[in-house]
Structure formats: structure tokens, C-alpha cells
Regions:
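Catalytic cores of alpha/beta
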Residues: 55-58, 228-236, 275-293, 333, ...
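Bateman/CBS regulatory modules and CBS-like beta-alpha motifs in cytosolic regions of diverse proteins
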Residues: 23-40, 46-48, 77-115, 122-124, ...
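Active-site-adjacent beta->alpha loops and helix N-cap segments on the catalytic face
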Residues: 25, 74-83, 141-145, 165, ...
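Short beta->alpha transition motifs characteristic of CBS
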Residues: 69-74, 117, 121, 128-144, ...
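Alpha/beta catalytic cores of nucleotide-metabolism and tRNA/nucleoside-modifying enzymes
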Residues: 1-21, 99, 161, 286, ...
């Protein structure tokens, strides 16, 4: 029997405290998602159909992280989710949604509802701005067959010239008491749009993760050989794609990485999941811009039990990160996170960012079903290897595409997690724990954290001592749950 080495996970280790001159509030938590994309905080919401669609992705990006839209939907639906994130907020909207004057009120309302916007510019066939239609114009309009040109606020409108900065726009908003500011060229053609909502969001979420156009960043999951999905996502403006598989160290994944990077060399591509240095080396050499680590650590994943395969997560992160570092490729730790301390341990072990599923599945923004059980609220949460998820489309992730439904071999379960409110509150607690850890170690940023970190291996008695013991909890803390 060939036993290579002893492997450890989060509960097997603790970080040693060090001399510190750094307070938790002073630490910097920006990091790399990929070789080319920076995050303002190191958390990513998982590409799972009970965790991340546009609502979760929007909030994660506003908080400085990122959401990965799952692929358990057709291409058109996934593209729509990406567009909802990209159009949810902008500095200057360079491709604003618009309508023509002959469109009906019903058509305009449908567009506004789809993109969750409160108004649209109205342009003629030459793209000249001839009016704007807002909720104010529609408030008392009952005839939905009426034409937009009969209801809209007609030109002349308050506008701004090309090159208008957000600071200039704020002055115009303040002076004219308007909510939308169209950007026009010298001929009066629509070139962009700035909204008061986006300026408010800019102040409310100063650490938002945005692209060069001021739009929120978003990633989306793809499968092996799904070039048509990649094409559509690139057209929609996706910032990164995540090649999602249970076994990233396989020919199909490596070939897909090469194909995508050959066609779209400037598209950031994250590949996984892996758990060994050899896998990290193969994906980095194939062209991956980040690698995702985790074979079976997730709370709803049964891969290690069903297949007998996997590597405990701390050891997997350490091994993959040391290899990926040779190529300048960041590592994403995916799975097994139960507490904020696990995030700190994963980063200290070499990960650049952390993908989270179960801790976000119970939030307002997750797409899972909200229900009540024994007087307490829960949301549904399932693994992408569960029977339900595989039947809906994720079977290719486990190399079972084309398998009839009653012959599927699941590698995950379906369950429930407690309802926890907004993502904003959950992330606040998780980042608070990370900042505290960095303060204990004396690290000013994540790179310094990794350089300073020293681990000790603990016994089962040490783990028991680490948790609450010899007392009955009467009031639960927001960052420590008894049933975890």
C-alpha cells in the first residue's frame, strides 16, 4: 500500500499568534482572483443553483468580491443573469437600454421590468435623443397600448456632453433635481447614461468590484467543450469564466482550457477542481488564469465517500498553491468553510481567494426556496452532484452527461440551511473574523499574512477545547452556530 503522506484539513490545525503592531481595522484584504483581476475582498459565491444568480452576484460585487453564475440553465438564461449584473450599476452606462418612440407602453414596461430599471431614454432611427420615459411618466398611465412618444417627457432634456465625469454629473443632478442624465454627442445622439442611483451606490459601496467601465464584475460557469456558451457569455460582457468540473486534472478540462484561451486570449479563465501539485501544473501550463482547489470538502458533497477519492483541504491548498505560485497563478480554495477562521486558515495556507457555498445559501439573495420547518426559517441548499441538480443539467460536471436519470450516481445531497438574512451581514462577520486573524498574526495584508503564518497541528482534545465547552449557550452569536 502506497501511503504518500499525512494530509490535514481546517479542524486539524490552528494558526500560531505572533508579535503584532497591526490592528484588525488596519489590515488590507484586497487580493487576486486571477492573474489579471483584483478583488477588494477575498470572497466568491459558488457556482451553485441554490447559491448564485444575479441577486447574489450583484451583492457580492458591491461588497468587493465576486459571484459566479451557475450553469444549470440554458445559455440564454445564463446570459440574461450576467447582463442583469453588468447593467445593475455603472459609472457611465456606455450601452444604455433604450426604446423607440413607436414602442408601446407595455413593451417599455416589460424592458424596464426585465432589467430592473426605472426609466429608459427614447431615441429615433438616427440614435438622436428625443425623450425619456420614467416611472413618473407612467404612474397614471392605464392604456398600455399607448405609444411611448405620447407619454414620455420630450426633449429638450437635461443632458451632459461626452467626457462628463461622475463628479461633474453629481453637480448637474444636484442643480437640476433629475434622476437620469443622458450623455449625448454634438449631434444630440445618445452616447451613454448616468443615473443618480449609481452615484448613490458608489458612496454606499466604496469597495465595489468594478470593471474599467464602472460596471460590477461577474463570472459565469461553463462545462467541457461548451464553446457556444463561452461565445455568448463573452458577448454579454462576462469578466471571467469558471470551467467547472469535479475533476479538473483530466483531458477534457485541459483541452477546453487550451481551446478557450486560444480563441479568447484576453478572457480570464478559472479552471478546477483539483487537489494536487501535478494538477495545478497541468492547468497552469494549459493557460488557466487561476485554479480552483477542492475535491469533496463541501458540506453537501459526498465525492470522497462515494468514490473514496480526495485530499483534505488544507493540505490540498498548500500543495496546489506552492506549484501554482511558480506560474504566477492564484489559487481559489473551494469548499469546507464553516467558520471565518477557516477562511483565514485557507488564505494563510496559500489561497488567494475563497469560494463559499453553504454560508451564503441561507441569505436573502440566494435563489434557494425559503420555507419554515419546526418554527424556524430555512432555505434549500443542494450540491451540484445531487440527483436534483444532475437531472437539471450538472451531470457533465461529474462526467455523467447522457446518463438516463435513474442510472445517475450522485456525489452530493439535497438539504437545508438556516435563513440568515442579507449577504451583507454574513460577509461582514466573515471578514471581521479574517481581520482579527491577521491582527493576531501581525500581518498588514494577505501576502504578508501568508509569509508570517505558522500552523500547529492539534489533537481531538485541542479541537474540543477550541470550541465552546462546559456551558449551555443561551444566546447564539452571529458568527458561531451550535449546529455547525
Amino acid at each position: 500500500m502506497n501511503i504518500i503522506k499525512r494530509a490535514l484539513t481546517f479542524e486539524d490545525v490552528l494558526l500560531r499568534p505572533c508579535y503584532s503592531e497591526v490592528l484588525p481595522k488596519q489590515v488590507k484584504i484586497h487580493t487576486k482572483l486571477t492573474k489579471n483581476i483584483t478583488l477588494n475582498m477575498p470572497l466568491i459565491s459558488a457556482a451553485m443553483d441554490t447559491v448564485t444568480e444575479h441577486r447574489a452576484a450583484i451583492m457580492m460585487a458591491r461588497l468587493g468580491g465576486l459571484g459566479v453564475i451557475h450553469k444549470n440553465m440554458d445559455i440564454t438564461s445564463q446570459v440574461r443573469e450576467v447582463k442583469r449584473v453588468k447593467k445593475s450599476e455603472s459609472g457611465v452606462i456606455i450601452d444604455p437600454i433604450f426604446v423607440g418612440p413607436k414602442a408601446s407602453v407595455a413593451e417599455a414596461l416589460e424592458i424596464m421590468a426585465e432589467y430592473r430599471i426605472s426609466g429608459v431614454p427614447v431615441i429615433d432611427s438616427d440614435r438622436k435623443l428625443i425623450g425619456i420615459l420614467t416611472n413618473r411618466d407612467l404612474r397614471f398611465e392605464n392604456d398600455y397600448s399607448n405609444l411611448v412618444e405620447n407619454v414620455m417627457t420630450k426633449a429638450p432634456l437635461i443632458t451632459a456632453p461626452k467626457g462628463c465625469t461622475l463628479d461633474d454629473a453629481e453637480k448637474i443632478f444636484s442643480k437640476n433635481k433629475v434622476e437620469k442624465l443622458p450623455i449625448v454627442d454634438e449631434q444630440g445622439r445618445l452616447e451613454g447614461l448616468i443615473t443618480i442611483k449609481d452615484l448613490k451606490k458608489r458612496k454606499e459601496y466604496p469597495d465595489a468590484n468594478k470593471d474599467s467601465f464602472g460596471r460590477l464584475r461577474v463570472a459565469a460557469a461553463i462545462g467541457v467543450g461548451q464553446m457556444d456558451r463561452v461565445d455568448a457569455l463573452v458577448e454579454a460582457g462576462v469578466d471571467a469564466v469558471v470551467l467547472d468540473s469535479a475533476h479538473g486534472h483530466s483531458k477534457g478540462i485541459i483541452d477546453t482550457v487550451k481551446s478557450v484561451k486560444e480563441k479568447y486570449p484576453n478572457l480570464d479563465l478559472i479552471a478546477g477542481n483539483i487537489a494536487t501539485a501535478a494538477a495545478a501544473k497541468a492547468l497552469c501550463e494549459a493557460g488557466a488564469d487561476a485554479v480552483k482547489v477542492g475535491i469533496g470538502p463541501g458540506s453537501i458533497c459526498t465525492t470522497r465517500i462515494v468514490s473514496g477519492v480526495g485530499v483534505p483541504q488544507i493540505s490540498a491548498i498548500d500543495e496546489c498553491a506552492m506549484e501554482a505560485k511558480k506560474y504566477g497563478v492564484p489559487v481559489i480554495a473551494d469548499g469546507g468553510i464553516k467558520y471565518s477562521g477557516d477562511i483565514a486558515k485557507a488564505l494563510a495556507a496559500g489561497a488567494s481567494s475563497i469560494m463559499i457555498g453553504s454560508l451564503l445559501a441561507g441569505t436573502d439573495e440566494s435563489p434557494g426556496e425559503l420555507f419554515t420547518y419546526q418554527g424556524r426559517q430555512y432555505k434549500s441548499y443542494r450540491g451540484m452532484g445531487s440527483i436534483g441538480a444532475m437531472q437539471k443539467g450538472s451531470s457533465d460536471r461529474y462526467f455523467q452527461q447522457g446518463t438516463v436519470q435513474d442510472k445517475l450516481v450522485p456525489e452530493g445531497i439535497e438539504g437545508r440551511v438556516p435563513y440568515v438574512g442579507s449577504i451583507k451581514n454574513v460577509v461582514h462577520q466573515l471578514l471581521g473574523g479574517l481581520r482579527s486573524s491577521m491582527g493576531y498574526v501581525g500581518a498588514k495584508d494577505i501576502e504578508d499574512f501568508q509569509a508570517r503564518a505558522e500552523f500547529v497541528e492539534i489533537t481531538s482534545a485541542g479541537l474540543k477545547e477550541s470550541h465552546v465547552h462546559d456551558v449551555t449557550i443561551t444566546h447564539e452569536a452571529p458568527n458561531y452556530k451550535v449546529n455547525q
